[in-house]
């Protein structure tokens, strides 16, 4: 047993991995990673893997990015962490100012992961309505079908992906779901369904929560900005808060800095995480407006404070990485560069997959910014997603399909040559699976 195999065996003995059926790893070994550089992960046998999903959608500018790493090292020498109640630090003050300026919002509230950020938004919306109207009638949340907002109980309550939700349904909050349009032909029907729901329940609804334009864990479903804009206007007319979950879609992933910018509307609450620290350290931020903040601003005796906290809220090291990430966006014209890069990736996929599309093995090739996805229809002995995952690893590619949806969300530093190599390898794998 070599060093890599020994580590994998120890892993199985002591670790329980997320979103994994551990029994499968008895025959399909876990891969311990020794180091990473750029878009590549390296195991202890020096095998390289192209990280084509940005390590669960977090890594924007490559692993071991020289600039972000240096800023992190600089911060370690000054301050690693301090509680954020009654204390603060320069990295978080700078980051908060920059995020507010980027989003044209007023205040930042921090946590350390996306699900917690959603929980904060739900609590804050409910609490703000209560403080303003002194009524507890507004206690429901409205979300889109096929949506995903995290895996804590509150976040699961406003999600609609059965794989994650069904087991825990008896524990979840009662909420409302309105249909997301599957295509532009369904926009009017979806809006009419929303109108009927609002006519019946608007007095009970705290907030409408949505992932703008792209439902990532919902098989990378892209939906209309026109629908979202109209849905938001309908909710606003009924005094319903708007929560945009940009945990996965923020920081350039959909082609603009934030996806909601493409809808020309602003939320009451904006949830950010994943790419915020460039993929280095856990961090999330909820942004809101002074109109919300002022509901809580009062003498202590009035008991209006928002009492929510996490031990590592606003960690100084994570904030230093986030500031470094924003520096790169500012200095390197990332959004404009990504427009050209995303076009190249899509065209490469389109050309390479054309024969498989003609054979109806592949369909619905789509992209939004730096997100690319398509459906695969191949019969395999084991489930398709696992078969693709295994074969791509052997080709040196890291992909984790969602059911029959294969997607790419690569770091923004991927080169044209790396794109061509990755796509060629992927097509070879699909051909192998098709031929059995």
Swiss-Prot record:
Protein name per UniProt: Adenosylmethionine-8-amino-7-oxononanoate aminotransferase
GO terms for MF: adenosylmethionine-8-amino-7-oxononanoate transaminase activity; pyridoxal phosphate binding
HAMAP family reported in the protein's UniProt record: BioA
Modification N6-(pyridoxal phosphate)lysine, positions: 274
UniProt-annotated binding residues for pyridoxal 5'-phosphate: 114-115, 245
Keyword Transferase: yes
One GO term of the biological process aspect: biotin biosynthetic process
Function: Catalyzes the transfer of the alpha-amino group from S-adenosyl-L-methionine (SAM) to 7-keto-8-aminopelargonic acid (KAPA) to form 7,8-diaminopelargonic acid (DAPA). It is the only aminotransferase known to utilize SAM as an amino donor.
Reactions it catalyzes: (8S)-8-amino-7-oxononanoate + S-adenosyl-L-methionine = S-adenosyl-4-methylsulfanyl-2-oxobutanoate + (7R,8S)-7,8-diammoniononanoate
Pathway the protein contributes to: Cofactor biosynthesis; biotin biosynthesis; 7,8-diaminononanoate from 8-amino-7-oxononanoate (SAM route): step 1/1
Localization terms from the record: Cytoplasm
Organism the protein comes from: Helicobacter pylori (strain ATCC 700392 / 26695) (Campylobacter pylori)
E.C. designation(s): 2.6.1.62
